[in-house]
């Protein structure tokens, strides 16, 4: 079978024709339309007007680096208000921005480690430990190219693990029988979430749809990886929940089954982000890899030395800044967007974005705000395929304008912006595709970071950036777009017959985006100790399911449309006990997301982590330590005397947040009573009168860390008036109420409370 061109009618374009198109303002006919680098084929919803088949490079700023002049590992930016820019920007990019882009169908490369898992397990063909081949009709053999091999201990500067070993290959087979395979079955030191990275070698006859299957906590998720690109580095599949120990139920399998003739190759598979292992100045950083700069991740990912260290080992600070763009160019070289760069990996990356925060203070308690940066006057005259550098300025301008619009609409704050700088910055000069730096806010100005540490601010900021990328990409290719919906609300579960429950929810309207309307929903189910399945797409805002007796079922729901998928609802649970005649209702009233406790007087400013550490969306690793200096008179200073200065005792620690999955713990505890059925709902369904409490033998009200903290962007309260009214009515009719929470009394101090 003749191998298709990777890009539409462009890789064979002559130099003269390319030069003739110099300065174009859109990609025009340049569009990658073949198989994406990675595709999750278990995804239940189809994306047609999102970022499907778009390959993006997105990163958070800075990271721990080795300072050769001063002789030690250090942060690139100072510690202020409990964090540093090196830590803070990751808390926007990793939990919010990248998932939004991936939910829209994008394939996102990020040059810094994305996984907050400190453990790392590598299974490789060279070590053979936990690696098992099965050759059927087609036989496995060693490739002619070098591959990955791991050795014990740390790695010297410049040591490339992807040239130290071998890789394996087998001919692809179209028939779904007598399939050859490789099983990667690691031993996990503890139960948890682990990113999964695969590696392989790209060869002349590589297939564009290699079949990978990830087995995780009794579930399986299927991927197709285009091995015609991106060989010889780590390729991210996804992040999954795995059980402790060694089991086939927690493994990765690669087969040679493919709809295309050719070669399937395989090398090592990596589970988890791990600890930094690159030696500089005689020592490693001693921190998880996700806290280090991109320079060290690039080396671990097999990037060439001229990408890892432009300074030839003399200046890690500059190397870290440069390698983000250089690694993007290395991956994208030879694709339709960088057709003249022949020595690359042919990954069709077409856009880069660096998320930073900035310095600067305002003595009048106003905002410093957001700044965009682009480079149009320096670097190559045009970008890849003759694209004008001015398209980057358009991108930066749209990012800044839309951030202000979306933040103002959501929070009515009159957010500040600082226009767009067109200056010579490495992260916008070196990329050979459109690029921008977005300085989110000032980490030195407390009014900025006070909002910036609120998870709802981070979500809204990230959603604005995602929407700008979506619209920008649609315009660059002349396509229509649809904005992914917001998560459903008023989620509830009720019995509709003796052994059947109905899940029901409401769509959430996004008043600022008319296209962000759900047209379907994904319902995810986890039974007992198993992980969540890959979901079922349904058209209506409800779903009926029969329950097996004695098993706790856990559910979550997302909203979908042609543009992608929303974030999920909280996890709700249900249980059917054989012979049960009464039902308990668990009400989840714990939805709070907040920054730490705020200190803001005429003389002091900052975060008091001891009084209240705040609640992130899930776990977060963005804190350096407790703030020590609250003296407002020292605003804008540097060093220990500066306002905001603090410690580093929390560096590398992943701090728990609101996981929105505590109903399942209550359901599992109640299961042992053995004589009750269980259903659950969000507290808003009770407040709005959508749940008849009188049907239930007991209401278990889960408040968690819910409270009115006085500073959050959204209002939270243990017992809101509507909830109190419904519970009072229930109790007056001899209902039984069990309440748990950290602030159920202290949050009710009003005269009418």
Where are these regions (language model features)?
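Extracellular carbohydrate recognition and processing domains
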Residues: 217-246
């Amino acid at each position: 079978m003749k191998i298709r061109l990777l890009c539409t009618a462009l890789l064979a374009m002559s130099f003269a024709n390319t030069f003739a198109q110099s300065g174009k303002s859109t990609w025009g006919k340049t569009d990658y339309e073949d198989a994406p680098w990675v595709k999750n084929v278990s995804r239940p919803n189809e994306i047609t007007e999102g970022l499907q088949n778009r390959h993006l490079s997105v990163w958070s700023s800075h990271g721990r680096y080795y300072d050769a002049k001063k002789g030690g590992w250090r942060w690139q930016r100072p510690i202020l208000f409990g964090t540093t820019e090196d830590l803070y920007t990751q808390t926007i990019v990793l939990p919010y921005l990248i998932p939004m882009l991936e939910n829209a169908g994008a394939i996102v490369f990020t040059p810094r480690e994305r996984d907050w898992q400190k453990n790392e397990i590598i299974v490789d063909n060279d070590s053979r430990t936990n690696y098992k081949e099965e050759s059927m009709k087609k036989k496995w053999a060693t490739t002619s190219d070098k591959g990955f091999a791991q050795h014990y201990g740390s790695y010297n500067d410049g040591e490339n693990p992807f040239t130290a070993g071998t890789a394996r290959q087998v001919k692809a087979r179209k028939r779904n029988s007598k399939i050859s395979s490789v099983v990667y079955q690691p031993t996990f030191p503890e139960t948890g979430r682990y990113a999964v990275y695969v590696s392989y070698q790209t060869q002349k006859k590589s297939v564009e749809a290699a079949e990978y299957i990830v087995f995780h906590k009794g579930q399986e998720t299927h991927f197709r990886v285009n091995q015609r690109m991106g060989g010889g580095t780590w390729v991210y599949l996804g992040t999954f929940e795995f059980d402790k120990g060694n089991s086939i139920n927690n493994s990765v399998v690669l087969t040679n089954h493919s709809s295309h003739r050719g070669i399937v190759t395989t090398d090592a598979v990596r589970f988890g982000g791990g600890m930094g292992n690159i030696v500089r100045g005689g020592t490693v950083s001693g921190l998880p890899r996700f806290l280090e700069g991109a320079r060290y991740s690039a080396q671990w990912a097999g990037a060439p030395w001229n990408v890892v260290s432009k300074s030839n080992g003399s200046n890690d600070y500059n190397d870290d800044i440069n390698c983000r763009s250089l690694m993007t160019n290395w991956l994208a070289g030879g694709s339709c967007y960088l057709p003249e760069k022949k020595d690359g990996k042919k990954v069709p990356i077409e856009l880069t974005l660096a998320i930073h925060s900035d310095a600067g203070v305002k003595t009048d308690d106003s905002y410093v705000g957001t700044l965009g940066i682009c480079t149009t006057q320096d670097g190559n005259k045009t970008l890849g395929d003759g694209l004008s550098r001015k398209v980057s300025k358009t991108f930066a301008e749209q990012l800044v304008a839309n951030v202000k619009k979306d933040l103002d609409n959501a929070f009515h704050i009159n957010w500040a912006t600082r226009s767009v700088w067109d200056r010579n910055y490495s992260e916008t000069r070196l990329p050979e595709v459109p690029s921008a730096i977005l300085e989110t806010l000032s980490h030195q100005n407390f009014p900025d970071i006070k909002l910036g540490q609120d998870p709802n601010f981070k979500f809204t900021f990230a959603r604005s950036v995602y929407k700008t990328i979506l619209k920008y990409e649609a315009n660059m290719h002349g396509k229509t777009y649809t904005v992914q919906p917001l998560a459903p609300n008023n989620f509830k579960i009720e019995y509709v017959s003796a052994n059947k429950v109905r899940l029901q929810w409401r769509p959430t309207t996004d008043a600022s985006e008319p296209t962000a309307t759900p047209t379907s929903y994904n319902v995810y189910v986890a039974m007992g100790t198993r992980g969540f399945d890959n979901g079922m797409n349904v058209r209506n805002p409800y779903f009926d399911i029969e329950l097996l007796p004695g098993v706790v079922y856990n559910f979550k729901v997302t909203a979908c449309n042609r543009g992608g998928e929303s974030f999920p609802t909280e996890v709700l649970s249900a249980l059917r006990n054989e012979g049960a005649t009464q039902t308990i209702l668990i009400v989840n009233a714990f939805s709070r997301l907040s920054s730490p406790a705020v200190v803001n007087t005429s003389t002091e400013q900052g975060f008091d982590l001891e009084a209240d550490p705040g609640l992130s969306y899930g776990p977060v690793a963005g804190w350096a330590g407790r703030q020590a200096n609250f003296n407002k008179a020292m605003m804008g200073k540097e060093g220990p005397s500066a306002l905001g200065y603090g410690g580093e005792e929390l560096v590398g620690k992943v701090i728990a947040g609101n996981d929105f999955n505590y109903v399942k713990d209550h359901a599992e505890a109640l299961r042992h009573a053995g004589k009750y059925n269980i259903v659950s709902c969000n507290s808003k369904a009770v407040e709005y009168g959508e749940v008849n409490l009188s049907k239930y033998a007991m209401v278990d009200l889960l408040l968690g860390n819910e409270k009115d903290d006085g500073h959050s962007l959204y209002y939270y309260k243990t017992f809101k008036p509507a909830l109190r009214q419904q519970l009072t009515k229930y109790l007056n009719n001899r209902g039984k109420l069990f309440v748990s929470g950290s602030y159920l009394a202290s949050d009710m101090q009003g005269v009418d409370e």
